Amino acid sequence: MLDLEMNSLMIIRKSEYKRATWKNGLGFTDEIAIYPEGASLAKGDFQWRLSSARIESASPFSMFPAHDRVLVILRGNGIRMAHRYEEGDPEEINEVGPLEPYEFPGDIQSRCELMKGAITDFSVFSETGRIGAQVAVQELSPDEDFIWNSEGRWNFAFAIDRSIDTDAGNLPEGDTLSCGPGEVRLTAGGHGAKLLLVSLEALG
């Protein structure tokens, strides 16, 4: 079992992700990590959550009144996000391209339209006013040794397109490295690699 209290260096394998139904029941999500232990997507009682999902058609997004969201398109050509902040307001439309972290509040009406086919996304949920989230895409050059100064209480490195070597061992594409604060060595192979780096911190 993943122990997120210990902040130890470990790899979460794709085979360990938990399949769950979207809150609105219109699709599925692969849950990578959730905190605290025992929290669930259905109850919405989590402080933070990491997940990935495939979106194959235009879809409304589930509402999460107590959470902020960051979405990153891992595969696919992009989406149009539409938000309505208040009933009766016109929608705000934003185009989101691949590997562009996109932040939006979870307590508003949101939907997406696919620009050119299905996408796979990565989502970070953080409890509003309680958890701060930093999300960035890091591209490693071929054979590069990258030292990640992971500053959050909880930190994760997701291998987007290729496997990399880490202080915890090999991190295959689609797997996630979990660690506490400190320096972590991430080494790309001869073809380079792209990583998604997530740091989460308790506020106040």
Regions found by a protein language model. Give the residues of each.
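Jelly-roll (double-stranded beta-helix
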Residues: 1-204
